From Swiss-Prot:
This is Succinate--CoA ligase [ADP-forming] subunit beta. PANTHER family: SUCCINATE--COA LIGASE [GDP-FORMING] SUBUNIT BETA, MITOCHONDRIAL, SUCCINYL-COA SYNTHETASE BETA CHAIN. The gene is sucC. It comes from the Bacteria. Heterotetramer of two alpha and two beta subunits. It comes from Bacteroides thetaiotaomicron (strain ATCC 29148 / DSM 2079 / JCM 5827 / CCUG 10774 / NCTC 10582 / VPI-5482 / E50).
Length: 376
């Protein structure tokens, strides 16, 4: 679960990490009022959406007067970043930055531990730094039995700050970030940039926290911060109906029984140059009601131009699945092409049933199904 920058900064402040003064606004007039209240010569207006790349998309602007504050706030509130509409902005006091750093804690599956990542090259282009100059990213695996005691925090801090005063401040921030990570079952805690101001203060100018969805039941306070996007609302609705659904950006809707087969289906589509619109595991039922609900879910996405149904019949027989599909599509009013691949128990009976129904195009292999979907 992701949260907004302003929410992450509230958590940072609670744990003693310095952040700049800021106000959340939902209108351009509110942004002007926040600018006046701050009494600062310059403020930064930031779009509050649950995605990265806000700066490059024009969602972060520096202003120094009320007219520009109003206009830029209005522009940002009217934009969409990576398909996400901007409904709120953060007006923050502009900080005189001497240097920018990158700091994060996340899970490293190679070391099977929490890993601390730091860089003296913080800012918007940290992804480019990681690609072009990976040696500039410092990594430390954290032993879960030791954690991050003072001596380790100071040792890691000295990697970026040679002077003891700054290293001491950095060590305290590292310990606070690690505490946030562990106490809240996070999967990512990130500061980019962590700014060294002209006055020598270390301050989190941006804040990002991602929480482990599977641990949210232990943190009702964290769950209360959830601000679902439209996609997440759809995914939650699918979960309530017994599906595993993840939205993607392609145009081939996928309906599959079994997570592994669903992943393999998506891989096959990508292998042949297509783009899946979703991951959708409907489970092992041949219940036509479930198929109807799954199709409604797929057809909500206007990008979907064809549906690929890939079913493996194990305990669930393919002829039962075919009957369920026929009953379901008798209720569905759509002329979208539907490719069906059945394999497993009674697969020949299932295919014969579907061939008698003009609604379906039949494939015998997963590769054939993927190619048919791509060409449709």
């Amino acid at each position: 679960m992701k949260i907004h920058e302003y929410q992450a900064k509230e958590i940072f402040s609670k744990y003693g990490i310095p952040v700049e003064r800021h106000t959340l606004c939902r209108t351009a007039a509110g942004a002007v009022a926040a600018y006046k209240r701050m009494g600062s010569d310059r403020v930064v207006i930031k779009a509050q959406v649950l995605t990265g790349g806000r700066g490059k998309a024009g969602g972060v602007k520096l202003v120094d007067n009320t007219e520009d504050t109003y206009q830029e706030a209005k522009n940002i509130l009217g934009m969409s970043i990576k398909g996400l509409p901007v409904n709120q902005i953060l007006v923050s006091e502009a900080v005189d930055i001497a240097a920018e750093y990158y700091v994060s804690f996340t899970i490293d599956r190679n070391t099977r531990s929490v890993i601390l990542m730091m860089s003296a090259s913080g800012g918007m282009d940290i992804e480019e730094v990681a690609r072009q100059s990976p040696e500039k990213i410092i990594r430390y695996a954290i032993d879960p039995f030791i954690g991050l005691p003072d001596y380790l925090a100071r040792r890691f801090a000295f990697s970026l700050f040679p002077h003891i005063e700054q290293a001491g401040r950095m060590a305290a921030i590292l310990q606070a970030l690690y505490k946030i990570f562990m106490e809240n079952d996070a999967s990512l805690v990130e500061v980019n940039p962590l700014a060294l101001t002209a006055k020598g203060i270390l301050m989190a100018i941006d804040a990002k926290i991602v929480f482990d969805d599977n641990a949210l039941y232990r943190h009702p306070d964290v769950l209360s911060l959830f601000d679902p996007t439209e996609e997440e609302k759809v995914e939650a609705d699918a979960k309530n109906k017994g599906f595993s659904y993840v939205h993607m950006d392609g145009n081939i809707g996928c309906m599959v029984n079994g997570a592994g087969l669903a992943m393999a289906t998506m891989d096959m589509i990508k292998l042949h140059g297509g783009n899946p619109a979703n991951f959708l595991d409907i489970g092992g039922s041949s219940n036509p009601v479930k198929v109807v609900e799954a199709m409604k879910l797929l057809l909500q996405d206007e990008k979907v131009k064809v549906v690929l149904i890939n079913i493996f019949g194990g305990i669930t027989r393919c002829d039962d699945v075919a009957i369920g599909l026929i009953q379901a599509f008798d209720q569905i009013k759509s002329d979208i092409p539907v490719i069906v691949r059945l394999t497993g128990t009674n697969e020949h009976l299932g295919r014969d049933l579907l061939r008698n129904h003009s609604r379906f195009q039949i494939a015998t292999t997963m590769q054939e199904a993927a190619l048919m979907a791509i060409k449709s």
